[in-house]
Amino acid sequence: MPKVALYNQNGQTVGEIELNDAVFGIEPNKHVLFEAVIMQRASMRQGTHKTKNRAEVSGGGRKPWRQKGTGRARQGSIRAPQWRGGGTVFGPVPRSYSYKLPKKVRRLAIKSALSSKVLENDIVVLDQLSLEAPKTKEMVKILNNLSVDRKALIVTDELNENVYLSARNIPGVKVVPANGINVLDVLNHDKLVITKAAVEKVEEVLA
Protein backbone atom coordinates (compact mmCIF):
# COMPACT_ATOMS: atom_id res chain seq x y z
CA MET A 1 0.00 0.00 0.00
CA PRO A 2 1.37 3.44 -0.91
CA LYS A 3 2.20 5.63 2.09
CA VAL A 4 2.08 9.41 1.94
CA ALA A 5 2.71 12.13 4.50
CA LEU A 6 -0.22 13.60 6.42
CA TYR A 7 -0.12 17.39 6.80
CA ASN A 8 -1.98 19.94 8.88
CA GLN A 9 -3.15 23.35 7.62
CA ASN A 10 0.16 24.91 8.69
CA GLY A 11 2.07 22.64 6.32
CA GLN A 12 3.58 20.56 9.14
CA THR A 13 3.86 16.77 8.83
CA VAL A 14 1.71 15.18 11.53
CA GLY A 15 2.01 11.55 10.47
CA GLU A 16 1.55 9.13 7.59
CA ILE A 17 -1.47 7.65 5.87
CA GLU A 18 -1.70 4.33 4.04
CA LEU A 19 -3.67 4.60 0.83
CA ASN A 20 -5.68 1.69 -0.51
CA ASP A 21 -3.76 -0.15 -3.23
CA ALA A 22 -6.93 -0.88 -5.20
CA VAL A 23 -7.70 2.84 -5.51
CA PHE A 24 -4.42 4.76 -5.29
CA GLY A 25 -1.88 2.09 -6.24
CA ILE A 26 -2.92 0.65 -9.61
CA GLU A 27 -1.07 0.96 -12.91
CA PRO A 28 -2.76 3.94 -14.66
CA ASN A 29 -4.56 2.89 -17.83
CA LYS A 30 -3.94 5.74 -20.28
CA HIS A 31 -6.46 4.57 -22.86
CA VAL A 32 -9.25 4.39 -20.28
CA LEU A 33 -8.29 7.88 -19.05
CA PHE A 34 -8.53 9.14 -22.63
CA GLU A 35 -11.96 7.56 -23.09
CA ALA A 36 -13.22 9.04 -19.81
CA VAL A 37 -12.04 12.55 -20.69
CA ILE A 38 -13.68 12.34 -24.14
CA MET A 39 -16.93 11.19 -22.48
CA GLN A 40 -16.89 14.08 -20.00
CA ARG A 41 -16.07 16.67 -22.62
CA ALA A 42 -18.79 15.31 -24.92
CA SER A 43 -21.40 15.74 -22.18
CA MET A 44 -20.27 19.37 -21.74
CA ARG A 45 -21.13 20.24 -25.36
CA GLN A 46 -24.18 22.45 -25.81
CA GLY A 47 -25.61 20.76 -28.88
CA THR A 48 -27.92 23.70 -29.63
CA HIS A 49 -26.84 24.05 -33.29
CA LYS A 50 -29.66 24.44 -35.81
CA THR A 51 -30.22 25.48 -39.42
CA LYS A 52 -33.55 25.86 -41.23
CA ASN A 53 -34.59 23.48 -43.98
CA ARG A 54 -36.74 24.52 -46.96
CA ALA A 55 -39.93 23.95 -44.96
CA GLU A 56 -38.80 26.27 -42.17
CA VAL A 57 -37.35 29.19 -44.16
CA SER A 58 -39.75 32.11 -44.52
CA GLY A 59 -41.30 32.61 -47.97
CA GLY A 60 -41.10 30.56 -51.14
CA GLY A 61 -44.71 29.42 -51.23
CA ARG A 62 -45.34 30.65 -54.78
CA LYS A 63 -43.74 29.14 -57.87
CA PRO A 64 -41.28 31.82 -59.09
CA TRP A 65 -42.20 31.42 -62.78
CA ARG A 66 -44.27 29.12 -64.91
CA GLN A 67 -43.03 25.63 -65.61
CA LYS A 68 -42.57 25.92 -69.38
CA GLY A 69 -41.90 28.52 -72.01
CA THR A 70 -39.42 30.85 -70.29
CA GLY A 71 -36.23 29.15 -71.46
CA ARG A 72 -35.01 28.98 -67.88
CA ALA A 73 -34.66 25.95 -65.64
CA ARG A 74 -37.84 24.89 -63.91
CA GLN A 75 -38.15 26.08 -60.30
CA GLY A 76 -40.76 25.31 -57.66
CA SER A 77 -39.72 27.62 -54.82
CA ILE A 78 -37.24 30.41 -54.15
CA ARG A 79 -36.43 28.67 -50.86
CA ALA A 80 -35.13 25.47 -52.48
CA PRO A 81 -31.52 24.65 -51.41
CA GLN A 82 -29.91 25.88 -54.65
CA TRP A 83 -31.27 29.41 -54.12
CA ARG A 84 -29.54 32.15 -52.14
CA GLY A 85 -31.47 32.32 -48.87
CA GLY A 86 -32.87 28.85 -49.43
CA GLY A 87 -33.13 26.08 -46.86
CA THR A 88 -30.20 23.89 -45.84
CA VAL A 89 -30.15 20.22 -46.78
CA PHE A 90 -29.23 17.83 -43.95
CA GLY A 91 -28.11 20.72 -41.72
CA PRO A 92 -27.33 20.35 -38.01
CA VAL A 93 -30.23 19.88 -35.59
CA PRO A 94 -30.23 20.16 -31.78
CA ARG A 95 -28.93 16.98 -30.16
CA SER A 96 -27.26 15.71 -27.02
CA TYR A 97 -23.65 14.55 -27.41
CA SER A 98 -23.53 12.89 -24.00
CA TYR A 99 -23.03 9.15 -23.60
CA LYS A 100 -21.92 6.86 -20.80
CA LEU A 101 -19.04 4.44 -20.60
CA PRO A 102 -19.68 1.19 -18.71
CA LYS A 103 -19.55 1.58 -14.92
CA LYS A 104 -16.45 -0.64 -14.61
CA VAL A 105 -14.58 1.51 -17.13
CA ARG A 106 -15.58 4.73 -15.35
CA ARG A 107 -14.38 3.33 -12.01
CA LEU A 108 -11.09 2.17 -13.55
CA ALA A 109 -10.60 5.65 -15.03
CA ILE A 110 -10.97 7.51 -11.72
CA LYS A 111 -8.69 4.97 -10.00
CA SER A 112 -6.11 5.47 -12.76
CA ALA A 113 -6.31 9.26 -12.37
CA LEU A 114 -5.85 9.08 -8.57
CA SER A 115 -3.00 6.56 -8.89
CA SER A 116 -1.21 8.79 -11.41
CA LYS A 117 -1.22 11.63 -8.84
CA VAL A 118 0.37 9.33 -6.25
CA LEU A 119 2.98 8.09 -8.76
CA GLU A 120 3.91 11.66 -9.71
CA ASN A 121 3.99 12.74 -6.04
CA ASP A 122 1.31 15.33 -6.77
CA ILE A 123 -1.03 14.43 -3.90
CA VAL A 124 -1.24 16.30 -0.59
CA VAL A 125 -3.29 14.72 2.21
CA LEU A 126 -4.56 16.98 5.00
CA ASP A 127 -5.67 15.78 8.44
CA GLN A 128 -8.54 18.27 8.14
CA LEU A 129 -9.51 21.44 6.29
CA SER A 130 -11.74 23.88 8.12
CA LEU A 131 -12.23 27.64 8.07
CA GLU A 132 -14.28 29.62 10.57
CA ALA A 133 -15.45 32.03 7.87
CA PRO A 134 -15.07 32.44 4.10
CA LYS A 135 -11.66 34.12 3.68
CA THR A 136 -9.73 33.91 0.42
CA LYS A 137 -6.67 35.24 2.23
CA GLU A 138 -6.78 32.28 4.66
CA MET A 139 -7.08 29.74 1.84
CA VAL A 140 -4.12 31.30 -0.01
CA LYS A 141 -2.12 31.06 3.23
CA ILE A 142 -2.98 27.35 3.65
CA LEU A 143 -1.98 26.57 0.04
CA ASN A 144 1.29 28.49 0.52
CA ASN A 145 1.96 26.50 3.72
CA LEU A 146 1.54 23.31 1.69
CA SER A 147 3.81 24.64 -1.12
CA VAL A 148 0.91 24.39 -3.58
CA ASP A 149 1.66 27.11 -6.11
CA ARG A 150 0.10 25.53 -9.20
CA LYS A 151 -3.40 24.51 -10.30
CA ALA A 152 -4.95 22.57 -7.44
CA LEU A 153 -8.04 20.44 -6.94
CA ILE A 154 -9.22 20.48 -3.32
CA VAL A 155 -11.34 17.48 -2.31
CA THR A 156 -13.32 17.53 0.94
CA ASP A 157 -15.44 14.73 2.42
CA GLU A 158 -18.59 16.79 1.86
CA LEU A 159 -19.41 20.21 0.43
CA ASN A 160 -17.86 22.74 2.82
CA GLU A 161 -19.30 26.16 2.06
CA ASN A 162 -16.56 28.15 3.83
CA VAL A 163 -13.82 26.25 1.96
CA TYR A 164 -15.67 26.59 -1.35
CA LEU A 165 -16.27 30.35 -0.97
CA SER A 166 -12.68 30.92 0.18
CA ALA A 167 -11.21 29.16 -2.86
CA ARG A 168 -13.52 30.17 -5.70
CA ASN A 169 -11.70 33.43 -6.47
CA ILE A 170 -8.23 31.86 -6.53
CA PRO A 171 -7.17 31.25 -10.16
CA GLY A 172 -6.60 27.57 -10.96
CA VAL A 173 -8.11 26.29 -7.69
CA LYS A 174 -11.31 24.22 -7.58
CA VAL A 175 -13.13 22.63 -4.64
CA VAL A 176 -15.25 19.47 -5.00
CA PRO A 177 -16.77 17.05 -2.47
CA ALA A 178 -15.57 13.43 -2.46
CA ASN A 179 -18.70 12.24 -4.27
CA GLY A 180 -18.09 14.80 -7.03
CA ILE A 181 -14.51 13.82 -7.85
CA ASN A 182 -14.03 13.09 -11.56
CA VAL A 183 -11.30 12.20 -14.05
CA LEU A 184 -11.26 15.51 -15.95
CA ASP A 185 -10.84 17.60 -12.78
CA VAL A 186 -8.10 15.36 -11.37
CA LEU A 187 -6.09 15.41 -14.61
CA ASN A 188 -6.73 19.09 -15.28
CA HIS A 189 -5.08 20.18 -12.02
CA ASP A 190 -1.40 19.81 -11.17
CA LYS A 191 -1.94 19.07 -7.47
CA LEU A 192 -4.56 17.02 -5.66
CA VAL A 193 -5.18 18.36 -2.15
CA ILE A 194 -7.46 15.93 -0.32
CA THR A 195 -8.55 15.58 3.30
CA LYS A 196 -8.14 12.34 5.24
CA ALA A 197 -11.93 12.03 5.57
CA ALA A 198 -12.31 12.45 1.79
CA VAL A 199 -9.70 9.72 1.18
CA GLU A 200 -11.72 7.35 3.37
CA LYS A 201 -14.93 8.24 1.54
CA VAL A 202 -13.35 7.71 -1.91
CA GLU A 203 -11.84 4.38 -0.82
CA GLU A 204 -15.19 3.25 0.59
CA VAL A 205 -16.84 3.78 -2.80
CA LEU A 206 -14.07 2.60 -5.14
CA ALA A 207 -12.21 -0.12 -3.22
Curated annotation (Swiss-Prot):
GO biological process assignments: response to antibiotic; translation
Q: What else is known?
A: Erythromycin, niddamycin, oleandomycin and spiramycin-resistant strains have changes in this protein as seen by gel electrophoresis; the nature of these changes has not been determined.
Its gene is rplD
Q: Where is this region: Disordered?
A: 44-78
For whether the record's keyword set contains rRNA-binding, the answer is yes
The record's comment on protein family reads: Belongs to the universal ribosomal protein uL4 family.
Official protein name in the record: Large ribosomal subunit protein uL4
Give a single Pfam family match. Answer: Ribosomal_L4
Does rRNA-binding appear among the keywords?
yes
